[in-house]
């Protein structure tokens, strides 16, 4: 197992090219060379396998040898197949192993079956951001435990997940949340007994403050906006789960729709599917000009230059997102958050032009119960 070996830590930027090539090939050509339990050659492949969640690493003593082993044979999917009984010995084990989150068909639109991946099943923040936060924290865990404190700017969900993880691992956290956020975020962080700074109108305003105060106080800045541990979480879990689930269900998967906040999960999805299943189109969804949708924003420049961008980016207004989410609730009994409503709206538009039978997947980052105040203006309509 990768965790049984000692290896000099590489930052993701150093091994992401190797990881992408490994995904594209689907096989590991050379073993990892060790002396005893220490990796001495093949560090990029070692960290790639570990970041992908492979359960095995082929090793040879002293020097690398040709092995040509498939990622599947190295346990690529093992960690996302879950526990049949769903019994866990700790909350950390729950967060790591309660996989995959559900994939459910919610609508037929013309020739398209529309499936929703329900990310509110993540237990800490009730959102996809549990994945991001766990990857950010575990990627810097030695530094975090040495310094004892973490600072981070967040629109809410990442901050909630970080505050929960702080209790699991035993460090303090200060989260910077904009005044425009729904009350769920600050209240949950306070419920965890951690510090929350509520000010400004956006995370863009708060990022310099979080960085400045982290440097002043000797805290670790997680920096979900620039740390590649963010999109790596979605290569390892979100994309891999969708790949496994769509194959299990026999889907004719043509497109995956996902909203863009930090753009971390879109980058993870685009990178994974372009390498492993290039016939699947990943579509990014952002707020239309003049619209505000919690947790997502417009991007003038792709923020993850080492990873693939979505094949297309679609604009959705806040009103369209809300009305589609409420329509889905009234059809299915499931109320997506506003960002999920935006992705569903984009998928429904695309389905109108679909000429053959196909399946689309929409990633729904969180539940609409967090946004009832915002939905209230459309209720009864």
Give the ranges of each region predicted by the language model:
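Residue-level signal for well-ordered alpha-helical scaffold segments within enzymatic catalytic domains
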Residues: 21, 51, 135-139
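Basic- and aromatic-enriched surface patches that contact anionic nucleotides/nucleic acids
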Residues: 29, 36-79
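Short N-terminal amphipathic alpha-helices
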Residues: 30-34, 57, 144-152
């Amino acid at each position: 197992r990768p965790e049984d070996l000692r290896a000099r830590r590489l930052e993701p930027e150093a091994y992401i090219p190797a990881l992408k090539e490994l995904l594209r090939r689907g096989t590991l050509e050379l073993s990892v060379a060790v002396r005893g339990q220490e990796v001495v050659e093949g560090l990029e492949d070692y960290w790639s396998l570990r970041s992908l969640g492979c359960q095995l690493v082929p090793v040879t003593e002293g020097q690398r040898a040709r092995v040509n082993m498939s990622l599947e044979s190295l346990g690529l999917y093992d960690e996302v197949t879950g526990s049949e009984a769903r019994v866990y010995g700790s909350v950390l084990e729950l967060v790591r192993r309660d996989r995959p989150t559900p994939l459910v068909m919610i609508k037929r639109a013309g020739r398209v079956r529309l499936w929703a991946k329900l990310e509110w099943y993540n237990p800490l923040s009730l959102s996809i951001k549990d994945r991001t936060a766990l990857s950010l924290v575990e990627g810097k865990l030695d530094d975090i435990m040495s310094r004892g404190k973490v600072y981070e700017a967040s629109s809410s969900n990442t901050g909630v997940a970080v505050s929960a993880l702080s209790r699991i691992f035993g460090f303090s956290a200060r989260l910077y949340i904009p005044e425009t956020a729904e009350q769920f975020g600050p209240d949950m962080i306070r419920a965890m007994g951690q510090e929350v700074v509520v000010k400004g109108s956006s995370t863009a305003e708060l990022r310099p403050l979080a960085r400045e105060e982290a440097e002043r106080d000797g805290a670790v800045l997680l920096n979900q906006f620039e740390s590649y541990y963010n999109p790596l979480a979605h290569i390892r879990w979100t994309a891999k789960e969708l790949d496994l689930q769509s194959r299990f269900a026999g889907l004719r998967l043509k497109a995956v729709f996902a909203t863009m906040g930090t753009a971390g999960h879109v980058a993870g999805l685009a990178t994974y599917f372009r390498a492993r299943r290039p016939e699947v189109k990943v579509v990014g969804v952002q707020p239309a000009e003049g619209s505000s949708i919690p947790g997502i924003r417009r991007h003038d420049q792709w923020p993850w230059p080492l990873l693939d961008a979505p094949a297309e980016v679609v604009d959705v207004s806040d009103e369209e997102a809300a009305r589609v989410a409420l329509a889905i609730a009234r059809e299915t009994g499931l109320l997506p958050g506003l960002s999920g409503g935006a992705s569903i709206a984009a998928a429904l538009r695309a389905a109108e032009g679909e000429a053959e039978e196909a399946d689309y997947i929409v990633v729904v980052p969180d539940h609409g119960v967090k946004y009832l105040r915002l939905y209230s203006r459309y209720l009864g309509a």
